[in-house]
């Protein structure tokens, strides 16, 4: 609506409008790097759990995950992929399936999925990371305080907001501005993927 009226607008992430300021991170690169680091720690069998695949962010994370799998010579068909909304009542059967298929590490698309998976695993008596490791492709303060703390991709929300604000000011002042900006990320390796 705002884009159609050429109202100055900024968003986090990418969208299909060229007249909107867009600030995002390299989600494909982040997923590839996190997965490669986990492969480097010895993990070979993964489950990737993503929400709605109509979102660009989830498609990018999917691509990055598979790039790492293929670059590191892992068989693509031995990795488990689950996409779409995962209802709470079906989470138990998903966990049972992952355990029976000997998945070593679950990579969740975001913090909410990670918290749901961790809660279910702990409720069923599994030990993280001894029985199964967990990582998230999006960080939040909650993942810092969980026990064990969760390995994650960290993108500074403050940096994203500041960049949107900076570009918006440039636009409003009639100065040159960037329509699309990519913000750096950091991989935080924490106890949820520790291997002895």
Q: Which residues make up each language-model segment?
A:
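Short beta-strand/turn micro-motifs composed of small residues
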Residues: 13, 24, 50, 83, ...
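Flexible loop/hinge segments that line or gate small-molecule binding clefts
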Residues: 1-29, 112, 138-150
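Alpha-helical structural signal in soluble globular domains
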Residues: 1, 5, 60-72, 116-124
């Amino acid at each position: 609506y705002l884009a159609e009226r050429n109202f100055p607008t900024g968003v986090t992430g990418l969208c299909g409008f060229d007249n909107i300021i867009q600030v995002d991170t390299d989600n494909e690169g982040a997923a590839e790097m996190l997965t490669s680091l986990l492969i480097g720690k010895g993990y070979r069998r993964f489950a990737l759990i993503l929400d709605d695949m109509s979102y660009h962010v989830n498609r990018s994370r999917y691509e990055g995950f598979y790039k790492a799998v293929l670059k590191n010579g892992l068989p693509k068909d031995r990795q488990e992929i689950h996409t779409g909304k995962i209802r709470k009542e079906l989470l138990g059967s998903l966990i049972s399936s992952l355990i029976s298929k000997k998945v070593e590490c679950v990579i969740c698309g975001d913090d909410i999925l990670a918290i749901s998976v961790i809660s279910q695993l702990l409720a069923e008596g599994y030990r993280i990371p001894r029985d199964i490791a967990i990582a998230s492709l999006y960080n939040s303060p909650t993942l810092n305080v969980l026990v064990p703390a969760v390995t994650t991709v960290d993108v500074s929300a403050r940096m994203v907001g500041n960049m949107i604000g900076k570009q918006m000011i440039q636009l409003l002042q009639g100065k040159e501005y960037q329509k699309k900006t990519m913000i750096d990320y950091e991989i935080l390796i924490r106890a949820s993927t520790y291997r002895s």
